[in-house]
Structures are given as structure tokens and as C-alpha cells.
Design a protein with these regions (language model features):
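Glycine-rich phosphate-binding loops of nucleotide-dependent enzymes
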Residues: 2-243
């Protein structure tokens, strides 16, 4: 079996004296979608942020395509074509949709024709953005801002796309549209995706494999559709939890 595109081994991180990650092991193979689910405060977003050096790992290692990136500066991760759509979207509200997308493209080493093809791809995935190219990002709806955040990440031509709570605060219809776009990218382009989500139902239906995090620990992992059928998952995250 080939080595994972992303391999996390024994990762620990903390905020002051509070340990947020307690020895995390996680793999993402090339061409797969992996979902990391768990309740609010479980440490999911902290894991995503630790990959980008905020907070810094106290111990353990993060390997990308076999290269140790545990302490690699954030700007260097773009060179490796690791892209993130962070929780809360964090678009540039005063910039137009087109300018936001260009910010993502600036991180990619691509020709003009490749940039044009990338832009057309994003606008095909998210037609709403095409209608609003000259509109300021801050005037978009929440769902449109999420589409823009993902589109900006895609413009950097990522080998690994990391999505942090992409369904947060969105209507079910918009969530389905966004998850359908992610599925399309994976199926047609082979894009590798790590998605952090409280919405276990959507995330596990999208993913090939899943991990469950509780209080900074991975407590369960496996094939996504098998995790969906486990009674403890259904009780905690589907029937009695957020769905």
C-alpha cells in the first residue's frame, strides 16, 4: 500500500496548560475524502489549525507526501499545495468575488490559460458566484460566502483540500449543494479532501472513511458508511445529536 498523502502521528497540542490534542493518529490517502466528526469542543478544528501551525504542535509529527511539515511555516504550505477553507469562511469582505478568487490563484504556479480554466471550473461548480463576480464578498449570503471560501481554496490548485465546518450555519439545501460540489471534485478530479464537521450525517455520507474525536482523542475510525450504522454514532450524532 502506498504511503498516505497526509499522515498524522502522535500529535499533541495545547492552549496554555489545556491539552487540546492528546496523541492523534490520522491518515488521508490520495484521492479519498476523510471526515473527522465530533461534538463542538472535541478538538476537530484545533487539529486543522495545528496542521497550519496555530497552535504549534508540542509533540508528534505531520507528514505530507512523506515530508515532515510539523513546523513548516504557514505560507510554505501553499507551496506544497495544501489549501484550507477555514471555519467562519474568512473571506475578504471589501474585495469583490473575483478579487477573492484571484487571491487564491496568486498562490498557484499556473499559466494564464490554466488560471482561466480553474476559474471556469469554480464558476461551473458554484454558478451563484458567476452571477456575483463584481459584488463585494461581505454582501453575499452565508452560503455564498462558503462557496467563495471553497472556490478561493480551489483556485490555488490544491493536492489536499481541508474544509473546516463547511455546513456551519447553512440551510440544508445550500449544504447539499456544497457537499455535492465536493463529491464532484473528488470523483472527476481525484481531489483529496479532509473535512471537519459536526454534521455527522452529511460528512459520513460524503466521505470514504471517518474518524470520531472526543475530548482531543480519536475514539473510533473506519469506513464511513459502516460508522453511520454503528449504534453509538447514531445515538450521539444522528438521533440525539446534530443532524
Amino acid at each position: 500500500m502506498t504511503s498516505p498523502l497526509l499522515a498524522i502521528r502522535g500529535l499533541r497540542a495545547a492552549y496554555g496548560n489545556i491539552e487540546a490534542l492528546k496523541g492523534i493518529d490520522l491518515d488521508v490517502q490520495r484521492g479519498e475524502i476523510v471526515a473527522l466528526i465530533g461534538a463542538n469542543g472535541a478538538g476537530k478544528s484545533t487539529l486543522m489549525m495545528t496542521i497550519f501551525g496555530r497552535p504549534r504542535a508540542r509533540s508528534g509529527e505531520i507528514l505530507f507526501d512523506g515530508e515532515d511539515i510539523t513546523h513548516t511555516p504557514t505560507h510554505e504550505l501553499a507551496r506544497l499545495r495544501i489549501a484550507q477553507s477555514p471555519e467562519g469562511r474568512r473571506i475578504f469582505p471589501r474585495m469583490s468575488v473575483a478579487e477573492n478568487l484571484q487571491m487564491g490563484a496568486d498562490a498557484a504556479e499556473a499559466s494564464e490559460s490554466e488560471h482561466a480554466a480553474d476559474l471556469e471550473r469554480v464558476l461551473t461548480l458554484f454558478p451563484r458566484l458567476k452571477e456575483r463576480l463584481t459584488q463585494r464578498g461581505g454582501t453575499l449570503s452565508g452560503g455564498e460566502q462558503q462557496m467563495l471560501a471553497i472556490g478561493r481554496a480551489l483556485m490555488s490548485r490544491p493536492r489536499l483540500l481541508m474544509l473546516d465546518e463547511p455546513s456551519l450555519g447553512l440551510a440544508p439545501l445550500i449544504t447539499r449543494q456544497i457537499f455535492d460540489a465536493i463529491r464532484t471534485l473528488n470523483q472527476t478530479d481525484g481531489l483529496t479532501v479532509l473535512i471537519v464537521e459536526q454534521n455527522a450525517n452529511h460528512a459520513l455520507k460524503l466521505a470514504h472513511r471517518g474518524y470520531v474525536m472526543v475530548n482531543g482523542l480519536i475514539t473510533m475510525s473506519g469506513v464511513a458508511n459502516e460508522l453511520l450504522e454503528r449504534p453509538e454514532i447514531r445515538t450521539a450524532y444522528l438521533e440525539g445529536g446534530r443532524h
